Curated annotation (Swiss-Prot):
Source organism (scientific name): Marchantia polymorpha
Protein name: Cytochrome c biogenesis protein CcsA
Membrane topology: Multi-pass membrane protein
Domain of life: Eukaryota
Entry similarity comment: Belongs to the CcmF/CycK/Ccl1/NrfE/CcsA family.
Gene for this chain: ccsA
Transmembrane segments annotated in the record for this chain: 14-34, 37-57, 68-88, 97-117, 143-163, 228-248, 263-283, 289-309
Length: 320
């Protein structure tokens, strides 16, 4: 079987597995919680990670260079990074709710690479002389791993903000619960006539318990967001430094203020501020989450926005 055919089979199969996993995790979050299906989702994520790993190894073997030379390969590597982070976090935290964030991230990134990019961009190409360097693996790998970890940490921070916005709103919680058809029937026919009693002392205790559980969830999200970003920041630092050394070898200058370099520096500064507020100022919860949420958009601008729309040494020139 030709390598290109095997690559396509692995790419499309892994995408559908990630789509299936995303459906399971979100289905479990919204309404369905069947243990065998949850286990099937966990197994499917492991298989998807294995398939993407195999895809990257085959691409590496057939092209003769590490598969990070174009947007398609880097997007596939980013998707693989999301699946790896998912498996690590799920194993460390023993919580399946993290898959609500990581599974869609892997699926959407994979879908962008597999379904959106033109066929000519998905083909393996020979490296230009400037990229034929041992720094390719070091620099680009560190940058892509930092992107995936920082994006996951930022998504956890965004989740904190969403939960915080509803933390003190008890009635919307009740309303959202009764949005399901069967529960809505119970509410309208059995509970609504007792509207005055619905806010009784016991009900208020239930709401207090809900807010306590939300407070616990916010603390756990805040902890994992901090830990993941703390991992991504040194990876980003190593990626920028190795890129500077590589740039000096290739172009004779450590820093050229290329759009990619500029936005990488902005990304570094945003997450440096985040870590400063956590480690030095002792901030927790909403305030650092706002900074990390800003970092989420900055990372995407740095990775895709500059590459696709900007002009410079790192531009893929697809949209312009």
């Amino acid at each position: 079987m030709p390598f290109i055919t095997l690559e396509r089979i692995l790419a499309h199969t892994s995408f559908f597995l990630l789509f299936f996993v995303t459906f399971i995790y979100w289905g479990k979050f919204l309404y369905i919680n069947i243990k065998p299906i949850t286990i099937l989702g966990e197994i499917s994520m492991k298989i998807a990670c294995f398939f993407i790993t195999t895809f990257l190894l085959i691409r590496w073997s057939s092209s003769g260079h590490f598969p990070l030379s174009n947007l398609y390969e880097s997007s596939m590597f980013l998707s693989w990074s999301f699946t790896l982070i998912h498996l690590i976090l799920e194993n460390k935290s023993k919580n399946t709710w993290l898959g609500i964030i990581t599974a869609p991230s892997a699926m959407l990134t994979h879908g962008f690479a597999t379904l959106s990019l033109p066929k000519e961009m998905q083909e393996s190409v020979f490296l230009v002389p400037a990229l034929q360097s041992h720094w390719l693996m070091m620099h680009v790998t560190m940058m892509m791993l930092s992107y995936s970890t920082l994006l996951c940490g930022s998504l956890l921070a965004i989740t904190i903000l969403i939960i915080t916005l509803t933390k003190q709103k008890n009635l919307p919680i009740l309303t959202s619960y009764f949005n399901f058809p069967f529960n809505s029937f119970i509410f309208k026919n059995l509970l609504q006539p007792m509207e005055n009693e619905i806010l009784s002392y016991k009900t208020q205790k239930v709401f207090s318990f809900i807010n306590f559980r939300k407070w616990q969830l916010i603390k756990e999200l805040d902890n994992w967001s901090y830990r993941v970003i703390s991992l991504g920041f040194p990876l980003l630092t190593i990626g920028i430094l190795s890129g500077a050394v590589w740039a000096n070898e290739a172009w004779g200058s450590y820093w050229n203020w290329d759009p990619k370099e500029t936005w990488a520096l902005i990304t570094w500064l945003i997450f440096a501020i985040y870590l400063h507020t956590r480690m030095i100022k002792g901030w927790q919860g909403k305030k650092p989450a706002i900074i990390a949420s800003l970092g989420f958009f900055i990372v995407w601008i740095c990775y895709l926005g500059v590459n696709l729309l900007g002009k410079g040494l790192h531009s893929y020139g697809w949209l312009i």
